[in-house]
C-alpha cells in the first residue's frame, strides 16, 4: 500500500532531533557502575534471539539508592549486554502523535488496542528505527520496527510502514523528546529480558519545557508469558515496590506540560498517582 505523498503522515528530520537531544544529555551519575563488569556478558546477536517483540511487560519505578543492591541480587541469574566492552548505552527517542494527542489520550483514558509511534536512535552505534508499539486488548505489547537511515531517511518507506500499521492517514507531528541510558540483562534460565533505564530527561516539542529525572530509574521486565520465576521481580516486591503502568511518553508529556493543537494543557488525572510517586522518590536519599 502506498501513501499519497501530498499528505505525508510523518516527516522525519533526524538531524533536527539530534540537536535537541544533545542539549538534554545528562551524565551526572551518583552511583557506582563498576558492578556491571561483574556480570557474565552476552552479545547483541544472543540478545536478538530473545527479542520478545510480542510480550508481557511489568514496569517498576524505583529510587536510585536501591540500584546497587538490586544489581548485586541479579548477578547470579542474569547476563549483561556487552558491545565492545560497553554495558550502558545512550538512547534518544522522539515520539510522534496527532495534533490532538490521540495516542496520549488513549493511554490516559485506559483504552486498549492503542499505539505509540517513535523514532529511536541508538547513539553509540548511530542506528535508527521507526517503531510502532501496540498494546492489545489482552494487555500484550507488540512492537514492530524498520531500520532508518539517520542522515537521509526514506520518507516513502516511513509513511508506507506507519500507514499500514495504524490503518489511517492522520498526519503525525513531533510531540516529545526523551533521553536515557540503558542497561539490558537476559535471564540465564527463562525467556526474560530486563531493561534498566537511568538518567531520564524529557523535553516537549512545542513549548521546549524540560524535565530531568536523575534520582529514579525504571526497571522493565519483559517475558513471553506470566509467570516465570524472576529474581528481579522477587527482590523488587520484597522491598515494597509495586509494578506501575509507566509510559515514558505519557509521563514525559505530563511533566513537560505538553499541549494539543489549541495549546490546551493535556489532562493528566489518571497519572497523578505516578506523578506523586515521582515527587516522593525524588526526595528520597
Locate each region found by the language model.
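Phosphate-end processing signature that detects enzymes handling 5′-triphosphorylated RNA
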Residues: 1-285
Amino acid at each position: 500500500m502506498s501513501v499519497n505523498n501530498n499528505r505525508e503522515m510523518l516527516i522525519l528530520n533526524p538531524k533536527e532531533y539530534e540537536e535537541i537531544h544533545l542539549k538534554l544529555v545528562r551524565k551526572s551519575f551518583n552511583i557506582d557502575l563498576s558492578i556491571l563488569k561483574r556480570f557474565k556478558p552476552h552479545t547483541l546477536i544472543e540478545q536478538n534471539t530473545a527479542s520478545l517483540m510480542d510480550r508481557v511487560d511489568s514496569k517498576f519505578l524505583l529510587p536510585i539508592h536501591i540500584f546497587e543492591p538490586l544489581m548485586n541480587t541479579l548477578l547470579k541469574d542474569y547476563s549483561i549486554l556487552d558491545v565492545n566492552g560497553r554495558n550502558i548505552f545512550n538512547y534518544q527517542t522522539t515520539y510522534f502523535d496527532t495534533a490532538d494527542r490521540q495516542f496520549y489520550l488513549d493511554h490516559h483514558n485506559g483504552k486498549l488496542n492503542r499505539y505509540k509511534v517513535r523514532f529511536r536512535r541508538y547513539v553509540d552505534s548511530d542506528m535508527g528505527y521507526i517503531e510502532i508499539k501496540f498494546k492489545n486488548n489482552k494487555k500484550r505489547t507488540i512492537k514492530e520496527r524498520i531500520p532508518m537511515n539517520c542522515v537521509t531517511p526514506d520518507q516513502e518507506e516511513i509513511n508506507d510502514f506507519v500507514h499500514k500499521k495504524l490503518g489511517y492517514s492522520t498526519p503525525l507531528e513531533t510531540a516529545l523528546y526523551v533521553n536515557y541510558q540503558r542497561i539490558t540483562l537476559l535471564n540465564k534460565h527463562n525467556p526474560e529480558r530486563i531493561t534498566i533505564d537511568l538518567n531520564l530527561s524529557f523535553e516537549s516539542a512545542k513549548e521546549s519545557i524540560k524535565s530531568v529525572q536523575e534520582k529514579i530509574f525504571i526497571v522493565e521486565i519483559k517475558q513471553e508469558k506470566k509467570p516465570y520465576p524472576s529474581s528481579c521481580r522477587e527482590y523488587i516486591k520484597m522491598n515494597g515496590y509495586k509494578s506501575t503502568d509507566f509510559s515514558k511518553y505519557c509521563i514525559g508529556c505530563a511533566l513537560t506540560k505538553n499541549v494539543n493543537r489549541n495549546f490546551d494543557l493535556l489532562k493528566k488525572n489518571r497519572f497523578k498517582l505516578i506523578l506523586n510517586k515521582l515527587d516522593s522518590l525524588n526526595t528520597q536519599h
